[in-house]
Amino acid sequence: MHLKYRSFKLHKVVSEEHSKVQRAWSTMAGLPDNAWPLPLEFAPDERSKRRKGAHRPQFAKVWTQPGVTLSRPVAAHVFVNPYSGRKKGDVIAHEVCERLEQANVVTTVHRSNAPGHLVELAREADVPPGAVLLVVGGDGSLSEVITGRFERGSAADDVFGIVPGGTGNSQAHDLAIHSIDDAINTVLGGHVQSLDIGKVVLTEGLPGHEKEPIVRYSHNLVTWGLGVDSTIKAERMRWMGPLRYDVGIVMAILANQRRTAVLEMDGVRLEDDFTLLLIQNSQTGGSRLPLAPGASLDDGSMDIGILKSMTRRQIFRAFGMLKAEGRHVYHPRVDYHRFKTLTITTAKPTAINVDGENLGSTPLELTVLPRAVRLMVPP
């Protein structure tokens, strides 16, 4: 079914039964079963102060299922992005290896020498049972290692760990792993949760430099539209550190180019002009921005914030609300949904960002793989 966008502002709370609630409301509203689903809305956290005209939304639990505690790892294969975090990856990895060796954990280091190299290193690594694949870097580095293990066919049997060494470190932030100390204690604690993964099929290369289709496995986020434009601009200003994300967003807002796409979400089709699509597995992204307050890492679905076509003034307000603890979900031009499958097609190739890396272009196909990998987390 081909639809133009219709927005229905219904006051309901994000819950595990959201799909049943949506169907019930659709019936009451006289919509067909295959109509574009009604947007989810958030209950306000009335304990918070009102900012930007709204309370902070109630955030979902990061995990919906209990984890398990395994034996302490006997070995760690440490995958290092030396260029992450203002080129501090090697220094962080050296300290991590020293401290793990002191705890009688044998370490093997795999050092990347180019973007995408961690995929190859992870695919080729012989990791024995009882070892952890420990990633020193940011969200993109973890994505590369997970992708490499999927290509090897071993991802379901592996155990992954994170040492925050990138610029944003969104996944580590959501897991409360903020330092080397936190990462070491997490590894030695042996507590593991199962993490949803997004299987992303897209065209390699940014617009104008397209190659063949590739597959990447996303643990954090996928973005299309203004957000990708801003990160492309931000990558040219890496010397600015995290501030580059804010500068990039302002530059992209001022440009405010028109973006038309066809979305198909869980089999329902929609064509419209959009400002930004925020597709999230975790709650934060970029420089730890609260992009998806309703996201959980193991609920078998991913969340999407749809920022519809906006004026520059509306965009600035929406981003101000976003930075104010995720209040953008209350903006009248923002709708929030949850899905298991999603496609994005455009008349011309447009850029896609996966886990903080500008990897390719549309068309895009995304399928959620429920609880597909195991990740070490604080107890």
Region annotations inferred by a language model:
Residues 223, 227, 278-293, 358:
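Glycine-rich phosphate/pyrophosphate-binding beta-alpha loops
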Residues 227-230, 271-273, 285-288, 312-315:
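Short acidic/glycine-rich loop or secondary-structure boundary segments that cap or lie
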